[in-house]
Amino acid sequence: MPERPSVPRHLLGIEGLSAEQLVPFLDLAESYALLSRSRSAPRDALRGRTVINLFYEDSTRTRTSFELAGKRLGADVINMSVATSSVNKGETLLDTAATLNAMRCDLLVVRHAQSGAPALLSRKVEASVVNAGDGTHEHPTQALLDALTIRRHFGRLEGLTVAICGDVGHSRVARSNIHLLTAFGNRVRLAGPPTLLPGAMAGLGNVELYSDMDRALEGADVVMSLRLQKERMGAGLVPSAREYFHFFGLDRRRLALAKPGALVMHPGPMNRGVEIASDVADSDQSVISEQVEMGVAVRMAVLDRLSRARMPA
């Protein structure tokens, strides 16, 4: 009888995790999604546990989603405001780690502009660490919620063609999704301007690069649109928003190139009229609102499973 995958202590990224290690997160999240819809989520799974949300970058969806997830499981949730904390007064990340460690929190959710910051914290604190997005590196819970959304519609997470379009080069969401989707044996197409499409990504598995958006969408089961991350861009990578939409915007004509009923996804926030047309974002094929809903369920599952790793045997 095969051994069951062990419960991880941290969730720092998707890279290196097998499909067998990822499925338990998705299965538990599925059950939490059903319970949340019936308003009967277990309120005591994290009772007596403390979750600290430490966000060095602005966030609405992810921080709120983690806060709801912790509270629905009965945890004490603390949102640390970096703008008014000692961090803003010059405290280093390692000093912050020492302070948080002294507070004896159980789970630490971290978003940081620097790639690798959550991994560094995980080596310095006793708490379980969840990466809520680090630089351009990874955003593992976003990939999990995207995977759950896809699985709910197709009944499987294998053998699909997924087109990820837009600012791939600066996207931690794209990287985590590439690792997850290829782990399950899917075909991934990356589409965008050559300036935003690093060639190294072709070496991440069953991945194809396209500078022609139309070709990338032909026969796709899922189309995932990404926003232009201007805060991480240098000058001149994209001539103008109008020109970008002309060549790489997801509109009705382009969506028709994908398979009938193909899912339309976006991690948010959306720039309507830049990477996606409003009538596509609001269409029956769009599952963008469902992604947000699944985000809470996935984060409940992540906090729950990581907390079990801290329980004595």
Curated annotation (Swiss-Prot):
The reply on keyword Transferase is yes
Q: Which cysteines are joined by disulfide bonds?
A: none
In alphabetical order, the GO MF annotations are: amino acid binding; aspartate carbamoyltransferase activity
Enzymatic reactions: carbamoyl phosphate + L-aspartate = N-carbamoyl-L-aspartate + phosphate + H(+)
Question: Which UniProt keyword terms apply here?
Answer: Pyrimidine biosynthesis, Transferase
Q: What is its EC number?
A: 2.1.3.2
Which pathway is this protein assigned to? Pyrimidine metabolism; UMP biosynthesis via de novo pathway; (S)-dihydroorotate from bicarbonate: step 2/3
Query: Per its UniProt entry, which superkingdom is the organism in?
Result: Bacteria
User: Into which EC class is this enzyme placed?
Assistant: transferase
The residues the record assigns to binding L-aspartate are 89, 172, 227
Any one GO CC term of this protein is: cytosol
Q: Which residues bind carbamoyl phosphate?
A: 61-62, 111, 139, 142, 268-269
The processes (GO biological process) annotated in the record are:
'de novo' pyrimidine nucleobase biosynthetic process; 'de novo' UMP biosynthetic process; amino acid metabolic process
What job does the chain carry out? Catalyzes the condensation of carbamoyl phosphate and aspartate to form carbamoyl aspartate and inorganic phosphate, the committed step in the de novo pyrimidine nucleotide biosynthesis pathway.
Per UniProt, subunit arrangement is: Heterododecamer (2C3:3R2) of six catalytic PyrB chains organized as two trimers (C3), and six regulatory PyrI chains organized as three dimers (R2).
Family statement drawn from the similarity comment of this UniProt entry: Belongs to the aspartate/ornithine carbamoyltransferase superfamily. ATCase family.
Protein name, per record: Aspartate carbamoyltransferase catalytic subunit
Tell me the organism.
Gluconobacter oxydans (strain 621H) (Gluconobacter suboxydans)
